Amino acid sequence: MNFKKGEVLFFNKPLGWTSFKVVGHVRYHICRRIGVKKLKVGHAGTLDPLATGVMILCTGKATKRIEEFQYHTKEYVATLRLGATTPSYDLEHEIDATYPTGHITRELVEETLTHFLGAIEQVPPAFSACMVDGKRAYELARKGEEVELKAKQLVIDEIELLECRLDDPEPTIRIRVVCSKGTYIRALARDIGEALQSGAHLTELIRTRVGDVRLEDCLDPEHFKEWIDRQEIENDEDNN
């Protein structure tokens, strides 16, 4: 392997890790292994700390391929709690409002999901990395400032109801989504809740695929040190 010339690595991001932490962890162990102080490493699509799943990292000259990977379709499996919302649309914040769910049936959920197929407009979450007047939206939102973000067009290629537990004390649904770059599944949860005349937020999110890369193709960052120590390394000094 030649990390300076460029390698593409696939990881299953652990729960609680930021995307930044994954990149830093991988960079540290590559630099240690090949004996350099710095190396360009970047990822092809962030995942929230509370999400898990496929992350593609590029090293060295392969970082030029990041944009290519960003445009690949992504597949997610998401669990939504119905009847309650949070400011961030996930478990990062406490529930701020509750709504009735007694009118929701499996048939209503399935019919509602079809409305999200194809080209749709989506307003990103205030707690997101979108830029507002040169600052990240989440920086403003965490200060309690009002954040107004414009709707963005995106494409939902597939949406499927995998599980529907409406009789539970905290009703949940589990869905599979195949979507384009720029889709916020947290915002999709918000919009599905509203379309059901209720509320919803994300309680679990797994990115199961990016392009042709699936979870079974991925390394565990927590075992990356052991993995890289077993690899045969090319140290071609002409490829800085």
Curated annotation (Swiss-Prot):
EC number: 5.4.99.25
GO BP annotations, alphabetical order: mRNA pseudouridine synthesis; tRNA modification; tRNA pseudouridine synthesis
Top-level EC class: isomerase
Domain of life of the organism encoding this protein: Bacteria
Cited InterPro entries: PsdUridine_synth_cat_dom_sf, PsdUridine_synth_N, tRNA_psdUridine_synth_TruB, TruB_C
Positions of the catalytic residues: 48
Keyword tRNA processing part of the UniProt annotation: yes
Chemical reaction(s) catalysed: uridine(55) in tRNA = pseudouridine(55) in tRNA
tRNA processing among keywords: yes
Function field: Responsible for synthesis of pseudouridine from uracil-55 in the psi GC loop of transfer RNAs.
Family: Belongs to the pseudouridine synthase TruB family. Type 1 subfamily.
Name of this protein: tRNA pseudouridine synthase B
Organism annotation: Bacteroides thetaiotaomicron (strain ATCC 29148 / DSM 2079 / JCM 5827 / CCUG 10774 / NCTC 10582 / VPI-5482 / E50)
